[in-house]
């Protein structure tokens, strides 16, 4: 593990560096408070800090306060060194943000075990961060496909529409539905159906830009949100996705399972400004036509469909219900 040692006394610094290196630490040295703070800024892997109280430019107390007043992640565990052993000094050091306090001259064994305790704190904090990130990911993503879930993708669409209104840029929405998916489940089983859903999600994700949003609305329904994409381009993307989904079957347990998708497209440049729910309903109407026109194709929403959507939206909330 990397550790930062900040002390202005060359003899003390050399002695502490010798101990720390002998215990397996990768040591970075600083001679004053300002260089210590710069070292932490330059290398986020420095998670342990042994810092002297009395130093030029910025002392140990100022360093502690600067760290605690800055970003709290990644967490830096601070051991404050000083010749001051009065209880009020110890309280002042801990109150400034130090995690531990060691009075000079240091006992090497005591420093070693205190740093070991610091490492445990850092490891626990890292586990907490990973658990929090995992929970956040699970809350926003579909468990089967890894795509954004319904709530998350609608939230992204809402944000993109706000950005688009500021920039005057179009947004396209693609609503897709796998064709004859019930037949796939009935013929090959639900495990095979899940494999088809995962493969469809992979191809949809691979077929759009890195900053486009792809989500699973539920069942065999998918949605793509394409910022800065007009209706003509959105339709071309949808047609490409239809080809991608139908060209190659998915292999499952030695069986090749053919599949395809129908897609409806609606874009803000077709109808001027549009709400999230209006775009989705217009795209869904185009999807319905694509299904009835023979499936495995993409169709663009027409003005009549959008007018019908506008009439309906006047009697409904602005948001799409969760389910």
Predicted regions and their residues:
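Catalytic-core segments of nucleotide cyclases and related cyclic-nucleotide turnover enzymes
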Residues: 235, 268-300, 305-321
């Amino acid at each position: 593990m990397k550790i930062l040692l900040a002390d202005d006394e060359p003899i003390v610094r050399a002695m502490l560096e010798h101990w720390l290196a002998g215990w397996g630490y990768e040591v970075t040295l600083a001679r004053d408070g300002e260089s210590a703070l710069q070292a932490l800024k330059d290398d986020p892997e420095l998670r342990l800090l042994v810092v002297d109280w009395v130093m030029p430019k910025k002392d140990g107390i100022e360093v502690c306060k600067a760290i605690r007043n800055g970003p709290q992640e990644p967490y830096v565990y601070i051991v404050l060194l000083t010749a001051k052993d009065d209880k009020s000094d110890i309280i002042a050091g801990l109150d400034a943000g130090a995690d531990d306090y060691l009075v000079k001259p240091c006992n090497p064994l005591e420093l070693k075990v205190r740093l070991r305790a610091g490492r445990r704190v850092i490891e626990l904090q890292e586990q907490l961060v990973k658990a929090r990130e995992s929970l956040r990911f699970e809350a926003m993503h579909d468990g089967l496909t890894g795509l954004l879930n319904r709530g998350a993708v609608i939230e992204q669409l809402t944000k993109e529409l706000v950005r688009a209104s500021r920039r005057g840029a179009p947004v396209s929405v693609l609503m897709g539905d796998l064709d004859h998916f019930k037949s796939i489940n009935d013929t090959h089983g639900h495990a095979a159906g899940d494999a088809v859903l995962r493969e469809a999600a992979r191809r949809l994700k691979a077929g759009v830009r890195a900053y486009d949003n792809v989500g699973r609305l539920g069942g065999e329904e998918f949605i793509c949100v394409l910022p800065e994409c007009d209706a003509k381009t959105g339709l071309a993307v949808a047609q490409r996705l239809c080809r991608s989904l139908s060209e190659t079957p998915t292999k499952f347990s030695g069986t090749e399972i053919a599949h395809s998708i129908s897609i409806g497209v609606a874009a803000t440049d077709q109808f001027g400004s549009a709400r999230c729910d209006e775009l989705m309903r217009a795209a869904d109407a185009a999807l319905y036509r694509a299904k009835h026109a023979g499936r495995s194709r993409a169709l663009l929403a027409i003005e009549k469909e959008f007018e019908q959507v506008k009439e309906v939206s006047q009697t409904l909330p602005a948001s799409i219900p969760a389910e």
